Structure formats: C-alpha cells, structure tokens
From Swiss-Prot:
GO terms for molecular function: substance K receptor activity. InterPro entries: GPCR_Rhodpsn, GPCR_Rhodpsn_7TM, Neurokn_rcpt, NK2_rcpt. GO terms for biological process: positive regulation of flagellated sperm motility; regulation of uterine smooth muscle contraction. Belongs to the G-protein coupled receptor 1 family. Glycans are attached at residue 19. This is Substance-K receptor. A lipid is attached at residue 324 (S-palmitoyl cysteine). Pfam families: 7tm_1. It is found in: Cell membrane. Residues 57-69, 130-149, 219-251, 311-384 are cytoplasmic. The lineage of its organism: Eukaryota, Metazoa, Chordata, Craniata, Vertebrata. Keywords: Cell membrane, Disulfide bond, G-protein coupled receptor, Glycoprotein, Lipoprotein, Membrane, Palmitate, Receptor, Transducer, Transmembrane, Transmembrane helix. The chain crosses the membrane at residues 33-56, 70-90, 108-129, 150-170, 197-218, 252-272, 291-310.
C-alpha cells in the first residue's frame, strides 16, 4: 500500500540521512535504478492495459454484463488504479527518498491507492460469495442489478473508511532539505499506533477475506466435483456447463492464490519491522523493499492473463481488443462469442434444468435418468 510504504521508508530513511551529507545512504547506482525502473514500467504497462481491456470487454458487450462480471470490473478498476498511482509514484519516492508531488498529492497517495487495494480483495470476496450462492444454493434468489451496484458502492465506502486514518494524519516535512510525505500518528509511543494499524489492516484486508474465500471455494469445489452427470447426458450440454463451472472456479481460486502469495511478504515486512526497527537502517533494506513492493504490485497484472488463458470469452475479447496487432487474428467466432444470445433451446433447457434439479435432488445417480445437472443460474459460469 502506498501510504504504508511511504511512512516506513521516509521515517527510517530520514533518520539515516541526518547523519550523511551529499549522497544519501539509500542512493543506488544509475544502472540499478534503470533496472528497477524498467521492471516497474513493464508492470504498470501490462497491468493498466490488461485491466482496461477486461473492463472494455465486459462493458462493450451486453452478454458479458452479469453480476459476477460487474464485480470483476470492480476488481479490474481497483487493480488498474493501484498500478497507475501506487506503483508509479511510490516507486519514485522509494527509489529517490524525496517527495516531488506536493502536499495535496501526499494526502491523495495515502488515501486512494490504499483504498484501491482494499477494494481489490473485497471484490474477490464478493465474487466468491456470488459463486457460492449460484452453485451451492442455486434456488436462492440471485443479486439484482441495484443490489449489485449497492454492494460495489458499499465496498468502496468501507475501503475508504479503512484507508482514511493514514490520509488524516498525512503531512509534509522537510529533513535536511529533502521533502518527505509522512504519516504522523498522534502520541505514538514506541510505534504502537503504527503497529496496531498494520495488524488491523492485515486482519481485515488480508487474513479474514482469505479465510472467507477459502471456505467458500472449498464448499463450491466439493459441490461441483461430487455432482454426477446422468449417463445419457455424459456428452451433452450439461456436461459442458459443469466443466465450464469447474474451470471458472479454478480460475478464481488461482486469482485468490496469486493475490495471497504476492501480498503476504509485503504485509510481513511492515509487521516484522514494527518489532525490529533497526532493520530499516540496513543499507540493503531499500532493495528488499523495492523487490517486495514490486511483488505486491505485480498482483495487479496477473488477473487479465488468468482470464485470457482460462476463459474462452475473455480470450475472444482480448483478440478483438488487440486485432490491430499483426500477430493477432480474431475470427468470426470470437465476435459471436461475445455478441450472440443464448438460443431458444438453451433457454428452455435452463428452465427444464431448474425443474428437474428440484425433482431429482434426492435421487441417486442411477435414478436421475430425466434429471439435468448443473446450476440453473449460469450456463457459462466464466461469464456468469
């Protein structure tokens, strides 16, 4: 998170600089700075382009505008904002240890990018909850469009509330002629306020959402993988739909695992640093921080790649979006995949599915000769 990195880096780095002249203890050779700049630039370009394309694919094609995909839009928007604002400006600050962007942007940097990170994990949690209801409880009412929009708005409001303390206590200081953007916690004896904030953020924005998603996807997986297909339908549409649901769940589990792996070292960096403050005085800590921050920010660029690799509709959308590239050749099937509506027979089949699922809920596999398998909610779960 932008503010957290700024606070720790600047407060520690400032103390070191007060005993140095000219070049700071955290300066790095030009070639090293160029390598880091290239790594961060590549990350930002891939993340912004990929997430903007995901948003376009969903908004530009009516067939893709579904409850789960609106949460995916929210996730993509949050990741795009994190890459554009947090990764870019925090890298400049961490590599130079000077705040170039003014007081107003100091407040902004300690609010909006942090909010976006919170929105990202909460959007993934909302997707897990939506899939849980659709697959485990298929006969329960699904979220309506107004409720979905209200949920997304609520996610942003909660995220803003969690990020606001850092923004409120943000300030500009000047140390040895260098401008700093720091968070001055009131009466923070021994850094207890900072440690408490890091622990609260870790629990509310990392640990608890991951526990909720782990439970949700575990139940979803058990429900899908134990679901049997009647023998006479083993090669029909129901089997394809069941496989599509499984593929979507695998994709979202991969998204969650990627987020968890990318962000865990970054959270631990700040929590452990609250107990061992002397580690921030080691010269190698700047390189450690830049590596951990890049790993955390890289989570913003993986999701579009996962969607493209594991979902045929998003793959078609990416081909259409990049059709101007000479090595990309979209087909008519790609266009139809995003624009055609389900056939009458498929819609009738979905209605029949709901009826027969209800009638055969307690039947064994051998008895369900007229049953339909799969949730009646989403024929193509990858574009639910």
């Amino acid at each position: 998170m932008g503010g957290r990195a700024i606070v720790t880096d600047t407060n520690i780095f400032s103390g070191l600089e007060s005993n140095t002249t000219g070049v700071t203890a955290f300066s790095m050779p030009a070639w090293q700075l160029a390598l880091w700049a290239t790594a961060y630039l590549g990350l930002v370009l891939v993340a912004v382009t990929g997430n903007a394309t995901v948003i376009w694919i969903i908004l530009a094609h009516e067939r893709m505008r579904t409850v789960t995909n609106y949460f995916i839009i929210n996730l993509a928007l949050a990741d795009l904002c994190m890459a554009a604002f947090n990764a870019t400006f925090n890298f400049v600050y961490a590599s130079h240890n000077i705040w170039y962007f003014g007081r107003a942007f100091c407040y902004f940097q300690n609010l909006f990018p942090i909010t976006a990170m919170f929105v990202s994990i909460y959007s993934m949690t909302a997707i897990a909850a939506d899939r849980y209801m659709a697959i485990v409880h298929p006969f329960q009412p699904r979220l309506s469009a107004p409720i979905t929009k209200a949920t997304i708005a609520g996610i942003w409001l909660v995220a803003l509330a969690l990020a606001s303390p850092q923004c409120f206590y943000s300030t500009i200081t000047v140390d040895q002629g260098a401008t700093k953007c720091v968070v001055a916690w009131p009466n923070d004896n021994g850094g207890k306020m900072l440690l408490l904030y890091h622990l609260v953020v870790f629990v509310l924005v990392y640990f608890l959402p991951l526990v909720v998603m782990f439970v949700a996807y575990s139940v979803i997986g058990l429900t899908l993988w134990k679901r049997a297909v009647p023998r006479h339908q083993a090669h029909g549409a129901n089997l394809r739909h069941l496989h599509a649901k499984k593929k979507f769940v695998k994709a979202m589990v991969l998204v969650v695992l990627t987020f968890a792996i990318c962000w865990l070292p970054y959270h631990l960096y700040f929590i452990l640093g609250s107990f061992q403050k002397d580690i921030y005085y080691r010269k190698f800590i700047q390189q450690v921080y830049l590596a951990l921050f890049w790993l955390a920010m890289s989570s913003t660029m993986y999701n579009p790649i996962i969607y493209c690799c594991l979902n045929h509709r998003f793959r078609s959308g990416f081909r259409l979006a990049f059709r101007c590239c000479p090595w990309v050749t979209p087909t008519e099937e790609d266009r139809l995949e995003l624009t055609r509506t389900p056939s009458l027979s498929r819609r009738v089949n979905r209605c029949h599915t709901k009826e027969t699922l209800f009638m055969t809920a307690d039947m064994t596999h051998s008895e369900a000769t007229n049953g339909q398998v799969g949730s009646p909610q989403d024929v193509e779960p990858a574009a639910p």
